[in-house]
Amino acid sequence: MEEKIFDISKLADSTYFADNRLPAHSDHHYYANEEEMLNEEMSMRQSLNGLWYFSYAKNLASRIEGFEKADYNCKIWDTIRVPAHIQMEGYGKPQYTNVAYPWDGHEELNEGEIPTENNPIASYVKYFTVPQGWNEVFVSFQGVDSAMALWLNGKFVGYSEDSCTPSEFDLTPYLVEGENKLAVQVYRFSSASWLEDQDFWRFSGIYRDVYLYTKPQVHVDDLFIHATPCNDYKDGKLSIDFKWNNENAKKLAVKLVDNEENVVIDTVQEITGATSVFTADVENVKLWSAEYPNLYKATFTVKDENDNVVEIIPQNIGFREFKMDGNIMKINGKRIVFKGVNRHEFDCYYGRAIPESKIAHDLDIMKLNNINAIRTSHYPNNSKLYELCDIYGFYVIDETNMETHGSWQIRGSVRCDKNTVPNDHPHWHEAVLDRAKSMLERDKNHASIIIWSCGNESYGGKNIYDMSEYFRKADPSRLVHYESICWDRVNEASGKMVLAMPDERRYDGTSDMESQMYTKVAQIKGFLSKYREKPFICCEYTHSMGNSNGGMHKYTDLTDEEPLYQGGFIWDFADQAIWTRDLYGNDVMNYGGDFGDRPCDYNFSGNGIVFADHAPTSKLQEVKFNYQNFTLVPSETGVKIINKSLFTNTSNYDLIIALAKNGKNVWQKKLTADINAGQTGEVAYTLPTFGAGEYVVTASLVLKQATIWANCGHEVAFGQYVFTKEGKADKKAVAPIKVVKSDFNIGVKGEGFSVMFSADRKMLTSYKYNGVELIEEFPKMNFWRAPIDNDNGCGMPFDTAQWKLASMYTKCVDMQVSENGNESATVKYTYELATRPVAHVVVTYTVTGDGVVKVDMDYKKVEGLPAIPDFGMLFTLPVDYDQIKYYGLGPCDNYIDRKEGGKLGIFTTTTQDEIQPYLVPQECGNHCDVRWFEVTDRRGRGVRISSATPFEASALPYNPHELENARHHYDLARPHHTVVRASAGMYGVGGDDSWGAPTLDEYITKNEDKHFSFEFKGI
């Protein structure tokens, strides 16, 4: 065999993407016998995970040449773990960038070219001996970022690109007796890097499993399962295409067992030839869906011509149909709604080299929060994800490893020229198709995958259209998705997207559905009022950067109102930040720029509904509610249940009716509801009678039985109803007060308390209760919040900056004191605010003999001022007052546009737990619809704030300005006080996007007349 030499210059050749790489195939496992299969131990596979010898170089010029030679001693090198990113193992720097390519600003490159100054090279070496009895030896690299060259015993074996699908090679011709030397060189940047410009941390290295494997004499190289329902979804048809490694005679024993261990098929097929097809009918088939992920267990036992078992293949099979019915996508005949999330393969400790246990943990979180769909943004994931999605029940959009927005999205404008990748450029055509083939061939047998995606934000053009056509031809059972089809309807003259009719678009057929990202609800409605030839999904929406996801219910409500709108995928699942320890040994989450990486996009990777360690954020409370499959509308006499599931009867759950009086549970009953999927029904009940008070009826559906992702009793849906029973208020005797008027202060004293107002400083300066001073600093009016990421993205802090100054700087222009005998005393301050035009706020304190201080804040609208981020007051208490108890919406924080998932009740928490560890400190901890709010020390001493009208409140260890000044949580000092905030209401958090979309107008606290009344009292 003629020896090949690797030509390093081909790294910059976009037509060179695979050399001697084996064809892609299905990801099935195979075992030598039944015992192996039961123990999941493959004797025909040998893992190469573990320590490899390793050498790092900054660029091609400084790499070690000749290291692959058999006599080059690499055993004196350092070692590195595999699988892992080299940057997570201390070699080079992690870099986070969104659109810009990593070399932008360092080297000026045309498309396909690679950097010369900074192109980290990772050289790996592993020594091994061939297991006894292995005649053929192959090696599989499940994921290498971004390109790799392979040698065995000094001989060049092959080359491969595509960081996210397997690269496999035949090592047999290069083997020697005894010890063999496997050498791999991994290049961070190759021409393929132009196709892999995803919005994520830029790593390199061998980051997925590596293993050797052999094949038996007779072997299934590939199988393609087609399992579809028929006869009006009552029965099933099974057809399986087999590709064999030779044409020898063989036998195939097929056994199919359902999820109750009933044998459905048990037969033997005699085969000759390199291909074969197995077909069978299945009566009374149990269909697969996200609601009922019914899987049949197949075992394919392969025997040679002498009837010896040579391999056994286990395979899960799900019967399901996903198709376009007219202009509606349907699963098993029912209109599907995607309650989805985008999932980057990322963990703060491992990067994209995620252990399998972490994958299962992610799916648990999703199921617990009613998520039914995953988009693998923007590359094929570890095969384990799809295996588990089949079992858990998720609808998956499997996305090709391609994103090129750095080649054409330039500072907010669109560029279409020779550097736009891939567009119609013929030299990218085969590389683009190769990525599609590698994904489809590996993943095709997973029932959970219902859509193939052509990548993300890679412009339009013929190359991507041809990819979509490949998907359709190779697998007609699935639909094809591509969001950037919009760039195939660009008006060439203006350079702007126009919503042209289909016959005016270049490649309208690329995507089977209209897919857009971050489109506002009103825009979706407008689009669908004109263009109804395809269903509409949001492949990315409700951008979850920091404190976000406001207004999400507008989108989920639209799925009920507009049949063509079939849901969306939240951006995204987990914050992307990297864990380290600081100089003091504290845990730190680092984002872009923290490693000295430039260019970078700083904290723009913090878009998760879970944090970087995959702990839940408070945003999940809203996601769970908006994604629930059942709408429960309770009343005083019964509950209406709208069953929005596709296949599930409510009788699968217990219906729990609970009654609370003034926040305390007083009654509960378990019922059963029998309402079919897609139907609406009512369940009656009779509530017990209690006295006057505010009542909350909570209706919940909870699991009757435990699942793999939740315990029995887990709540899947709830609804609440609030009503009030009036009664005669008890007249309480008013204790007398004493007013002390001095030269500089006004004192008000009563039984067990005292209040002091400064005539000099013009503010409330003291409130003592039971001899304890509760006010550490003067109460301050507050019109500001620590800007959230969405605020910064839309420029809200700049637009409303006057209100920050108004919160910090005021001037009292009038003070009035009045008494109502010995029953109450009133002190009224009029403050001029640091705004232009000048605004005034009147703060009135009324003290009564029971120790209550009533506060009234009044503002008269001043024309010319912007909207007001918040309207309330801050109280600073000692730091040991860190225990919170409140009657309002909880348990997680909520905002006027993100409170659908909050429950009205009494909750307890702490000031530290109310801090949400977003990558950048920002506003958090707010609670809406509060009746009363208590902050105490551990002995129960403190203050209660209440109001006759529901208000908003929070208690944190920091004030808004301290939060705003910090870029990381370690910038915040150890807490020295507790800041309690009472508010008439603040801005909603927004979330349509995080780079320009403001909070929806209805959730903005506008510049208008305002009145806020509340009272506080020591406890």
Identify the function of each model-found stretch.
Residues 2-40, 99, 309-640, 644-651, ...:
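Extended substrate-binding grooves/exosites of carbohydrate-active enzymes
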Residues 124-126, 165-169, 274-280, 681-685, ...:
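Short strand-edge motifs at loop-to-beta-strand transitions and within beta-strands
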Residues 3-18, 22, 30, 38-39, ...:
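Accessory beta-strand-rich segments of carbohydrate-active enzymes
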Residues 152, 235-270, 639-643, 647-671, ...:
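Beta-strand-rich binding/interaction modules
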Residues 176-179, 243-323, 691-732:
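Extended acidic/polar, glycine-enriched regions
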Residues 88, 95-97, 188, 289, ...:
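Beta-strand/loop-rich accessory regions of lumenal/periplasmic or secreted enzymes
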Residues 196-220, 576, 584-634, 639, ...:
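Catalytic cores of secreted or luminal carbohydrate-active enzymes
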Residues 88, 93, 98-114, 161-163, ...:
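An acidic-aromatic loop/edge-strand motif
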